[in-house]
């Protein structure tokens, strides 16, 4: 059962990771949002895992970018 508001907000927060100046705490915050949405039944486990994978990908991309530009 997909909740359009919850999924839209998760999509937005994951997209914002691309501009994050502090990707580690931002990743933790969004991961908490995903966990809560799954716990209260706004998204199912498959959707939550998909969001986690997308978040990890964006986090790694942003973290690598920040490491490159600061070197």
Task: Locate each region found by the language model.
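Short acidic DE-rich linear segments
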Residues: 67-71
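Short, charge-rich amphipathic interface segments used for partner binding and complex assembly
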Residues: 28-66
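N-terminal acidic leader/helix
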Residues: 1-31
């Amino acid at each position: 059962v997909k909740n359009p508001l919850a999924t839209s907000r998760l999509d937005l927060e994951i997209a914002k990771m691309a501009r994050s100046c502090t990707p580690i705490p931002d990743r933790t915050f969004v991961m908490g949002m995903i966990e809560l949405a799954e716990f209260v039944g706004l998204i199912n486990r498959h959707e939550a895992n998909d969001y986690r994978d997308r978040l990890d990908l964006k986090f790694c991309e942003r973290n690598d970018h920040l490491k490159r530009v600061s070197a």
